[in-house]
Amino acid sequence: KQNLTGLITVKDIQKNEDYPNACKDKNGRLRVGAAIGVSSDFMGRAKALSNVDVDVVVIDTAHGHSKSVINAVISLKKNIPQLSIIAGNVATGEGTKALIDAGVDCVKVGIGAGASCTTRVIAGVGVPQLTAIMDAVDVAKQQDIPVIADGGLRYSGDVAKALAAGANSVM
């Protein structure tokens, strides 16, 4: 009995040549992430995403150093241990430590650093982005947890500063 187990097209070959550094999983598929909040249906959403082999879930909130985010991370790691979790956003070493202790695989740093963001004003919480990155990295590097600098990137030099401050990546 003969079965078709795969199909490669000229377009597939061209994409591999054009994008040799594309981020792919062990099966050669592009990696996929999805953002969820911490509303009452977060677990159902995360399970549905895990069932379709999403690579990472991002718990995306304006202020990640909160009980709801920490409890969501703990619950997700307990119920879907294979799921990679990025959580944030935090602006302090303490917030970073709380998320790491809860079980995150990566921390997003930056509260209200974006040009159009009003989170600092509305929530009354925020730290200058470079300071937030350095404080988070000081804690995260002890546990070998990556840090994503999120926001405050208006000029190309801002990317260099975020990386120089220790962020593993920027968004």
Segments the model singles out, each with a brief description of its role:
Residues 1-171:
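Alpha/beta enzyme core
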